[in-house]
Amino acid sequence: MSVIEIRSYQHWISTIPKSGYLAVDCYADWCGPCKAISPLFSQLASKYASPKFVFAKVNVDEQRQIASGLGVKAMPTFVFFENGKQIDMLTGANPQALKEKVALISSKATGTGALASSSSAPVKGFASLQGCIENPQLECLNQQDDHDLKSAFNSNPSSFLESDVDEQLMIYIPFLEVVKVHSIAITPVKGETSSAPKTIKLYINQPNNLSFEDAESFTPTQVIEDIVYEQDDQPTIIPLRFVKFQRVNSLVIFIYSNVGEEETTKISRLELFGEPVGDSSKGKLQKVEA
């Protein structure tokens, strides 16, 4: 199977597999390192490509919307998807790193590797909204530099988001299009459920992140209290008042307190579920069948 050259946004949407893996080479015609490593990417595609593992290329100058949504800031950048969700990124023309990354994902695609994938906790009838998030505009106040918000959106089980000077976090999540948000899934850090969020306040359609002072003075769209985590390393699904989250272009999550009144709050993984509004999708969704 050859490398697919993405020609339009709709072509991009149709290329991302709902079930399986995707490796994307984000390049520019003027980029020397891009040209140097391009033959290797093609060789890897010839070796590993299958119906479960697709290889594609995106010209960042011609497909700016796609590049922006992927968070590409330098070339070349290689982006990897699992079941319609972005799971990893590799920046720079590093042949050995690219070989290792592709080989690892291939082992997951064929089910032969020790890290064979498991899907995230499903919300039946709805889809993960991770592909609809405008990643470059994500923001979190009071996060630790080494444990920032991006740590809660990747697939690395050892990474996590942690607050800094106290237990509170202010998370701003903008979307590439208007969505309906049905539920939030929060996974605690293994063995540290006491540091997981207990009370959260949600605010929709804010143009920017809120300050902690503003959040106290604004009326939340919904307040969720006394969150209970049955397993310390598994997602807890928190259904929202769906009628209040029908047209959402951004979501602010104010982590107000944690379960054990710990000094800092920790989140292993954060995921949103819902569906897009209208027929024009700007992000790839993975539907979870009932």
From Swiss-Prot:
Residues 118-290 form the PITH domain. One of its GO terms (biological process) is negative regulation of transcription by RNA polymerase II. InterPro entries: Galactose-bd-like_sf (IPR008979), PITH_dom (IPR010400), PITH_dom_sf (IPR037047), Thioredoxin-like_sf (IPR036249), Thioredoxin_domain (IPR013766). The keyword ATP-binding does not apply. GO terms for cellular component: cytoplasm; cytosol; nuclear periphery; nucleus. Has a role in cellular detoxification of alkyl hydroperoxide. This is Thioredoxin-like protein 1. Keywords: Cytoplasm, Disulfide bond, Electron transport, Nucleus, Redox-active center, Transport. Disulfide bonds join 31-34. It is found in: Cytoplasm; Nucleus. It holds the Pfam family PITH. GO terms for molecular function: protein-disulfide reductase activity. The gene is txl1. CDD domains: TRX_family. Residues 24-104 form the Thioredoxin domain. It comes from Schizosaccharomyces pombe (strain 972 / ATCC 24843). It comes from the Eukaryota.
